[in-house]
Amino acid sequence: HYMGLKTGLPTSKLTQKLEQNEFKLSSLLEITKAINNNVPIQTILKIFEYIIREQLGISKLILYTNNQVKWDCILHFGSRGLNKKINVDKELSHIQEITVIESSSIETLNSFDVVIPIIHKKNPIAYLLIGDLEEELFNISPGLKHMPFIQTLASIIVVAIENKRFSNEILEQEINNKEMELAGEMQKLLFPVDLPSNQQLDVAARYESKHLVGG
């Protein structure tokens, strides 16, 4: 083989590396473009699934995210119902970095090859389990060397989900505040400032948001 200039790599290896980098870059661009265009999360997850399944040839995956209350499985394929059997808090929360599962005392985890945590501000916000990696896939390309790339892609998606949820919460709060403000104005228009008050009659007016009283 002719050696690539300065790299010491044969041209075939160099071409392969360039192709891999091009694939990674285009995948990142596709995901970030979808997020910036405010594409629904389910559609973004479909793009992610296509990249992992069709382009990287990985046939088993589970993605859990934390919605502040509990762990949710937001994507799974090839998992044969295992996504419902794994207790994330008990079985995964100690994992802080990309971990190869060679053999685990937890039976459900033995069905997978790699656990990829998504850490944000030192806290795990998601876990990705990948399995059914072929031997050659596992050792060479696109096996373990692609795991940091998969972690980056998943991280971008999960942080986007967090941001969307946070934005929705803020929007809901703003709508509620506006409703209270408007109700206050309506109250001033509908009721006199001084309502009658004596021993026989005591009238007061106040507004309660339907969101706060469960109406």
Question: Where would I find each of the regions flagged by the language model?
Answer:
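… and, occasionally, acidic/histidine-rich disordered N-termini of signaling adaptors
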Residues: 171-215
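GAF sensory/regulatory domain recognition
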Residues: 49-53, 60-90
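Amphipathic alpha-helical coiled-coil segments that mediate homodimerization
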Residues: 27-35, 40-56, 63, 183-186, ...
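Signal-transmission linkers at sensory-effector interfaces
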Residues: 1-37
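Regulatory loop-to-helix N-cap segments in sensory/regulatory domains
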Residues: 125-153
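Signal-transmission/dimerization alpha-helices at domain junctions
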Residues: 1-11, 136, 148-172
